């Protein structure tokens, strides 16, 4: 659940710069979290070397891949509908091959290949380098599957091919997997245990992005704050590392500082943070460097200590609130966003009110809110009865959404009259005469184009707002240019 999901990007097909020598066409769609979109860029890079150019036209594809999400039942149902669409096209183009990547691949491998026979290959999140071999199997008329989870794989040696439509912002994966066995979450089972990527490969990827004109990167992982490089391997095995490995290990605040110092004119974001792993040292690094964005995505899921324990969250309500207090003290201009689940098994009205009161305490800038969706294979799915009525879940979720909307207005109004630095990302959807970008706090800002261009850092004085957007007038370029 702890993933930033951009609803506007769901199902976006990845179209990249083509190589003239490539003769085959790849159609790849992504669903779910930012990690899936990042992984699709890795996959496109691997297949580009194997003779594939990307296309946005499904009907002309030789190979169709969908990068899948298992976090909610709704996500899986959406992907199943897409698979039906792919197979309808395949009936008129029988040479087309269809494959499933990502979390559903690991979870439903046998069902897809053997029982329903709706795909030709199934590839888990740690097996993308094996795609050329798996495609060779498919060409020989055999089903192909690799969902083995790795202790080492981070794709640190793959240079992802980037989306050509923006060229300003990019995702940089730094960790894979998760060790926090939350009872509602499939991630540890579909993406494996935590392991971190070698720092120099991260720095090299960012250097490559900088040389190509990118202005902002997001350091990405299921749990970025627990980043720990000690020479490779699972984080849980760090206790067995040598004294030299322990002495030279790099943790997240050290990595964050390395990137901030190495690329002072590049904006740096990171996601996602887990409350128990966000230490004060990280906050001090954020406060020290102006190019580190002042936004923290800090999922809590519930404000009830009893429900947090049922979820196997490794923090209490009080510990979370104390962390919020630290953030406000050390990084006072930071925005904070949340993930929240309504209607977790056994949740009472008092548990729900505890969530509402926590939200009142924090007053989040924005959030990602869901009603509980039982996921097969999770501890909650195996051991807990989904006993909260759907009608009750829906009501509680709406109350959470309504309260978040109120707080978003409150936080947006705090910016009115202030001048904020905005990285121009695109032309506004609502007006071709306006630019749209985000400020350091990850809030969308819209302002008249004038003579500015995409990729500029512009100081904008905020004159009005909605709950999700700030509006203003440009007052000049910022010192980040």
From Swiss-Prot:
Its EC number is 2.8.4.3. One of its GO terms (cellular component) is cytosol. [4Fe-4S] cluster 1 binds at residues 33, 69, 103. It is found in: Cytoplasm. Binds 2 [4Fe-4S] clusters. One cluster is coordinated with 3 cysteines and an exchangeable S-adenosyl-L-methionine. Residues 24-140 form the MTTase N-terminal domain. Monomer. This is tRNA-2-methylthio-N(6)-dimethylallyladenosine synthase. It comes from Flavobacterium johnsoniae (strain ATCC 17061 / DSM 2064 / JCM 8514 / BCRC 14874 / CCUG 350202 / NBRC 14942 / NCIMB 11054 / UW101) (Cytophaga johnsonae).
């Amino acid at each position: 659940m702890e993933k930033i999901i951009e609803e506007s990007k769901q199902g976006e097909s990845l179209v990249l710069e083509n190589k003239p020598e490539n003769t085959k066409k790849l159609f790849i769609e992504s669903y779910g979290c930012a990690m899936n979109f990042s992984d699709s860029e890795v996959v496109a890079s691997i297949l580009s070397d194997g003779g594939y150019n990307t296309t946005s036209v499904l009907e002309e594809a030789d190979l169709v891949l969908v990068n899948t999400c298992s976090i909610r039942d709704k996500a899986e149902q959406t992907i199943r509908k897409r698979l039906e669409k792919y197979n309808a096209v395949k009936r008129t183009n029988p040479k087309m091959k269809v494959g499933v990547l990502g979390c559903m691949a690991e979870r439903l491998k046998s069902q897809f290949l053997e029982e329903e026979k709706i795909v030709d290959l199934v590839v888990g999140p740690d097996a993308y380098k094996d795609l050329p071999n798996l495609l060779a199997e498919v060409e020989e008329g055999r089903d192909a599957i690799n969902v083995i989870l790795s202790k080492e794989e981070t794709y640190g040696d793959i240079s992802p091919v980037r989306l050509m439509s923006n060229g300003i912002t990019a995702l940089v994966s730094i960790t894979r997997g998760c060790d926090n066995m939350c009872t509602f979450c499939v991630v540890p089972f579909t993406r494996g245990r935590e392991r971190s990527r070698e720092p120099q490969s991260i720095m090299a990827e960012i250097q490559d992005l900088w040389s190509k004109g990118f202005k902002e990167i997001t350091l990405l992982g299921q749990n970025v704050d627990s980043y720990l490089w000690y020479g490779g391997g699972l984080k849980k095995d760090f206790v067995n590392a040598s004294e030299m490995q322990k002495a030279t290990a790099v943790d997240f605040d050290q990595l964050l500082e390395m990137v901030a110092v190495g690329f002072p004119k590049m904006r740096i974001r990171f996601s996602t943070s887990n409350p128990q792993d966000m230490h004060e040292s990280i906050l001090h690094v954020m406060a020290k460097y102006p190019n580190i964005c002042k936004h923290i995505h800090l999922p809590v899921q519930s404000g009830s200590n009893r429900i947090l324990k049922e979820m196997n969250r490794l923090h209490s309500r009080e510990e979370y609130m104390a962390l919020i207090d630290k953030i406000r003290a050390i990084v006072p201009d930071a925005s904070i966003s949340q993930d929240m689940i309504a209607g977790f098994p056994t949740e009472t009205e008092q548990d729900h009110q505890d969530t509402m009161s926590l939200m009142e305490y924090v007053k989040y800038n924005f959030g990602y809110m869901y009603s509980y969706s039982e996921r097969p294979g999770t501890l909650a799915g195996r051991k807990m009865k989904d006993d909260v009525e759907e009608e009750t879940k829906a009501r509680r979720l709406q109350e959470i959404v309504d309260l978040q909307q109120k707080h978003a207005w409150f936080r947006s109004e705090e910016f009115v009259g202030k001048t904020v630095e905005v990285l121009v990302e695109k032309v506004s959807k609502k007006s071709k005469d306006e630019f749209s970008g985000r400020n350091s706090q990850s809030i969308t800002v819209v302002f008249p184009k004038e003579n500015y261009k995409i990729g500029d850092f512009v100081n904008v004085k905020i004159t009005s707002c909605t709950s999700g957007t700030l509006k203003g007038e440009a007052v000049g370029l910022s010192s980040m240019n």
